[in-house]
Amino acid sequence: MGMGWASSLDDSSYIRENLRVEGAILLAPGADSNGLAVMLADLVRQNLEAKPHKRSDFDAMRGSVAIVAEDAEVALTLQFSNGKLTIFDGIVGIPDVAVRASSDAIINLSNLPIGRLGMPIPTWRDKAGLAVVKDVMTAMREGRFKVLGGAFHPGMMMKLTRVMSVNG
C-alpha cells in the first residue's frame, strides 16, 4: 500500500513536469504548417521530457535564433524568453543568431555529442559523435553551414546545442 502512495506521487510529479514542458514550447500561428518548426518543437519537447536536467539551460535562454534550411526553402525563428520557446514560421525581427544550412545538417545537430563539461566534444571512442562533428566542421569549412552572430552569443549557442542534442 505504501508503494502505491509513493508511486502516485511519482506519477503526479511526472505529469506536472510534462505539463510544464508542454506549455513551455509554443508554435506561433502559421508555424504548424512549417514541417521543420514542428519537428524542432517536438525534438525540444522530447529532450526536456526525457532529460529534465536540460531544463536549466532551456530556462536560462534569452534571445532569438533564425534557422534557414536552404534546400527546403524553409525558415523559422526560435524565440526564447522566461523559460518559454515560441517557434515562428519565417524570420521574425532581427535574430541574435542565424543558422543557414541544409535541412539534413540542421537535423543532424541533434546528434551532436555532449561531453562531461557540457561541450559538444566527443570522446575518441565515440565514433558516431566524431562523425557528426566532422560533418558539421566540413560543411562549415565548405560554406554549406553558416552561423551568423554565434561568436557574439557563445553562451546562447552552447545552451542551444545542449537543449537540442539528444545526447548529454
Residue ranges of predicted features:
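Feature captures hydrophobic
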Residues: 2-168
